[in-house]
């Protein structure tokens, strides 16, 4: 059975509607468009089977497949919605308002049982940041940060606090994904000269510092972002300060830390100074990508030892996105950058395509691991709103533009559980599309009339660094040199360079004399398919045909050939046909 086509939910001033994913791209006839202009929030369940939205009057829950209305709640002011991982609970949040007499206002965070429609619990949650309770994937545990301590509830029983994690002032926490046992990463900011720290615990072992799985302390941290990998074996911590005391940046200072559940921790050494724009785990949980440094930014893949594996060089980028299967990586520059994207094959570290999505404010992978949506949404940009659906090879398959008097606020793919979509082999040739190429023409710099017939001089502020493989080559036993050895090496480098230059001059003269005697028959341009496997086959076929040509020359000169050599000559026509077929497929 073929996997389903994911839906794309679109929310804007035109209302709320759903679009069928590739290959049809038509509006879904199953989900009835909500034409209200006041749709404030939408949410899919984790498996994509349920969909909830608030239209300014009610919060509705429907079954995505049948579009049958399951529940409806009279909550006109709700601005945030989220389902629990197993679809048992719908969490809703609306802005908190105190009572007129100055006493505490009504609870603004509600947890509803999706099956019965009953409100299980209401809380007062003043801040919108981190408003939603966190669940373990099996919903055995639910946690909230209340007055600088973490409260844990078990089996969705919100009337009894099963456990508390109390430290000096817990500012933030993140539950690990995946199966039991659940782990918790907590952040406590520094105070009175004491450093900030992040600790990892295994639920419910919170009894003192010795019970922590790992601990990492640091001084430069006003706020942190904690990122678990999919297997819950390690956390990446981006520590940020609001002010950079060195004066190098207006936007503070960032450092990247690695903490593993086995107690190991390290600072990830980033080769270029500057801000950290984005850090993302590969879904395989054994490597991560960081985008960092003053523009043009560097992007590097690191392993679990925090050693660089591959450096993508520098470029106009500030974001990284792994595909759901982890086999493709997109590096992109959105926001104040032009929207240039680089699509990389992660296995071979080979560039697949370089599309440009100008003025994009949103990017997301489709759950099938083949398609991408980029969108220009309000209020970030209020003009040219719309979205495009791409194939990762660079082809635009669908383009939707909002009328000039309307706005689009949000687009969201229907999620699916892991394993629904199989991994497909990476393609390098652009898939066919009925839409024209989206590549903009490069803008020409103005040249005054006096300079128009003269050669152009380079006016680059900097040279972009090329990508390079950082893995140590197999067979090389080179060890890192000590400071003394490096100093001696620098001393001898000028002499060594002079010798090599002299040798090069001699060899150049001899090469020129031999080249004048032996002119090549024909210069054949090297054609590549873009697919490493096909290129390898073509190379091997040409090698075999060259050997057959040599055997034919030997036979013409009167040499007696062996039986196996004659058999090789007989295969020439078949090899030529195979080569022609491969080259036609380029």
Curated annotation (Swiss-Prot):
> Which GO terms of the cellular component aspect does the record hold?
cytoplasm; cytosolic small ribosomal subunit; eukaryotic translation initiation factor 2 complex
Q: Residue ranges under compositional bias (Basic and acidic residues)? A: 495-506
Record keyword Repeat present: yes
Alphabetized, the UniProt keywords read: Coiled coil, Initiation factor, Protein biosynthesis, Repeat, Translation regulation, WD repeat
Chain intervals for the UniProt region annotation (Disordered): 434-531
Q: Report each WD repeat as a residue range.
A: 23-63, 125-163, 356-401
Disulfide bonds listed in the record: none
Provide the GO MF annotations for this entry.
Answer: mRNA binding; ribosome binding; translation initiation factor activity; tRNA binding
- Biased region (Polar residues) positions are 470-479, 507-521
The family database entries (Pfam families) matched by this protein are listed as:
eIF2A
Entry-linked Gene3D superfamilies: YVTN repeat-like/Quinoprotein amine dehydrogenase
Give GO terms for biological process.
regulation of translation; ribosome assembly
- Coiled coil stretches, renumbered: 532-583
Q: Which family does it belong to?
A: Belongs to the WD repeat EIF2A family.
Q: What does this protein do?
A: Functions in the early steps of protein synthesis of a small number of specific mRNAs. Acts by directing the binding of methionyl-tRNAi to 40S ribosomal subunits. In contrast to the eIF-2 complex, it binds methionyl-tRNAi to 40S subunits in a codon-dependent manner, whereas the eIF-2 complex binds methionyl-tRNAi to 40S subunits in a GTP-dependent manner.
Q: PANTHER family annotated for this entry?
A: EUKARYOTIC TRANSLATION INITIATION FACTOR 2A (PTHR13227:SF0)
The name under which this protein is listed is Eukaryotic translation initiation factor 2A
Q: According to the entry, what is the taxonomic lineage of the organism?
A: Eukaryota, Metazoa, Chordata, Craniata, Vertebrata
């Amino acid at each position: 059975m073929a996997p389903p086509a994911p839906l794309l939910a679109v929310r804007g001033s035109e209302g709320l509607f759903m679009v069928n994913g590739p290959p049809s791209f038509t509006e879904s006839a199953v989900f009835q468009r909500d034409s209200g202009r006041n749709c404030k929030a939408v949410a899919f369940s984790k498996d994509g089977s349920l969909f909830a939205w608030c239209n300014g009057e009610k919060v509705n829950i429907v079954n995505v497949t049948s579009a049958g209305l399951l529940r409806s709640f009279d909550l006109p002011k709700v601005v945030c919605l989220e389902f629990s991982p197993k679809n048992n609970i719908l969490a809703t949040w609306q802005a908190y308002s105190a009572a007129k007499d100055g006493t505490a206002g009504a609870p603004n965070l509600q947890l509803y049982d999706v099956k019965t429609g009953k409100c299980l619990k209401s809380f007062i949650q003043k801040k919108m940041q981190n408003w939603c309770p966190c669940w373990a994937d099996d919903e055995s545990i639910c946690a909230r940060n209340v007055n600088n301590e973490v409260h844990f509830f078990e089996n969705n029983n919100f009337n009894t606090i099963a456990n508390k994690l109390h430290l000096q002032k817990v500012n933030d926490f993140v539950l690990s994904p995946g199966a039991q046992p659940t782990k918790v990463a907590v952040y406590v900011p520094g105070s009175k000269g004491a450093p900030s720290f992040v600790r990892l615990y295994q639920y419910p072992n919170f009894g003192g510092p010795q019970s922590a799985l790992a601990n990492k302390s640091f001084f430069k941290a006003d706020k942190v972002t904690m990122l678990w990998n999919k297997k819950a074996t390690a956390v990446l911590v981006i520590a940020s300060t609001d002010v950079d005391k060195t004066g190098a940046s207006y936007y503070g200072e960032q450092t990247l830390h690695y903490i593993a559940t086995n107690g190991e921790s390290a600072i990830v050494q980033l080769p270029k100074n500057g801000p950290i724009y984005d850090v993302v785990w590969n879904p395989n949980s054994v490597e991560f990508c960081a985008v960092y440094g003053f523009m043009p930014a560097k992007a590097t893949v690191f392993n679990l030892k925090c050693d660089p594996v591959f450096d993508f060089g520098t470029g106009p980028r500030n974001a990284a996105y792994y595909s759901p299967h982890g086999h493709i990586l997109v590096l992109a520059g959105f926001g104040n950058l032009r929207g240039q994207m680089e699509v990389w094959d992660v296995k071979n570290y080979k560039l697949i395509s370089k599309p440009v999505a100008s003025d994009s404010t949103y990017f997301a992978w489709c759950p099938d691991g083949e398609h991408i949506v980029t969108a220009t949404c309000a209020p970030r940009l209020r003009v040219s709103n719309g979205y495009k659906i791409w194939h990762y090879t660079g082809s635009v398959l669908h383009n939707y533009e909002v009328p000039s008097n309307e706005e689009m606020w949000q687009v969201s793919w229907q999620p699916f559980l892991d394993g629904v979509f199989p991994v497909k082999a990476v393609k390098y040739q652009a898939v066919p599309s009925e839409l024209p190429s989206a590549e903009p023409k490069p803008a020409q710099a103005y040249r005054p009339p006096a300079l128009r017939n003269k050669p152009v001089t380079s006016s680059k502020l900097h040279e972009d660094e090329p990508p390079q493989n950082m893995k140590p080559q197999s067979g090389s036993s080179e060890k890192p040199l000590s400071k003394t050895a490096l100093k001696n090496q620098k001393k001898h480098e000028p002499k060594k360079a002079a010798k090599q230059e002299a040798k090069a001059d001699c060899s150049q003269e001899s090469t020129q004399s031999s080249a004048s005697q032996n002119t090549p028959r024909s210069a054949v341009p090297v054609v590549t398919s873009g697919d490493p496997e096909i290129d390898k086959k073509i190379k091997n076929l040409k090698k075999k045909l060259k050997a057959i040509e040599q055997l034919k020359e030997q036979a013409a000169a009167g040499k007696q050939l062996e039986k196996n050599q004659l058999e090789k000559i007989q295969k020439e026509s078949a090899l030529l046909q195979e080569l022609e077929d491969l080259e036609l497929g380029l």
